[in-house]
Amino acid sequence: MGNLRLESSPETIVGGWGFEEDILTALGEADKLVAAEGNQFWFTGFYDQLPGVDVPDPESLELVRTDDWSLRTEVLYELDPDLFATDPNRFISYYGADGGDISEINDSIGPFFGNASRRKRGDDWPTWPGGESYAYYDIPEFVSRYGALLGKSETAAAINTLYEQALQEMRSRVPPASDRPSVGLLNAQINPDNEGFFRAYNPRTEIDKAYGKKQYRDLGIVDAFEGEYDGQSGIQVDYEALLEVDPDVLVFHFGVNYRDWNGEDALRKTVEGMRDSSLGQELTAVQEDRLYVGGSAYQGPIINLFQTEMLGKQLYPNEFGEWPGEITAGELPEIPEGEQLFDREELAEILTRASEATGSQ
């Protein structure tokens, strides 16, 4: 991420896959976004519950890559953004750029400011520009660093205070391990009908600061497949493997994203296929209707707050209150005010003040 200093506040920004966009939203800077790496993964549905908070339509943002994952360098030059709020090494690892390409973009278009901390980086992860491995950051550290860069340190401090206090309160409600249900964490889009298998994720990560599965870590998920991953982040499983461990609960990771995927509700297809399957109907989670929409892995402070609250209500209703949503409803429910676990009004006030400050710059 480095120690970048800007001569003036950026007017145009390229984002990432939703994480960076959520941080920019928290700091009142989202209206400066002109492009992204993966706009389909920026889930904006939670912002609807924050009065006065507006963000760009993710589909309005240019993509910096082609459908076959090549960098659209000519588009970057046309956009001429003031800042790339993303890790340049993703451009190398994902889109086929090399160090020379990144140096040219950095020098000719705009600087990079980002850090790939969603999950553990692979052994072959690039290390531009210094050639050395670099640190991971947690969500509050990202907020503070972007806040300092964009002249929003006071906003960053307010966001982090609310965020950390709310998470502490939610973590304090988690029941003892003996009272927690076992959980299978499945990809919301991959299923036997389209791939021949389900994909079960390991909810734990080797990096404590990684944000991709943070809510599962914070709420002490009891993993039905613990010990089965052999060092991998996920495994392929069929109905027989699911029935062997028979989780009390099934959570469909990325479910909020896959509800609207290329014009289709991929989550609904996965869930309805399971409910229609004779083997699926033998699963305890299906019989007891404990199938739940899971969150996005691309979560900054705002999205993570909502997703942690959501998961707590899904797994531990006695301690967190009931989750009122039906998984195939097509939209997320609003939690009644008396059952909310963090203050929406306070959060919205911080965000709208930050946006007003941005507009007056």
Predicted features by range, described:
Residues 3, 100-196, 294-357:
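Extracytoplasmic substrate-binding proteins
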Residues 18-19, 25-29, 78-81, 89-90, ...:
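Sec-exported extracytoplasmic/periplasmic mature domains
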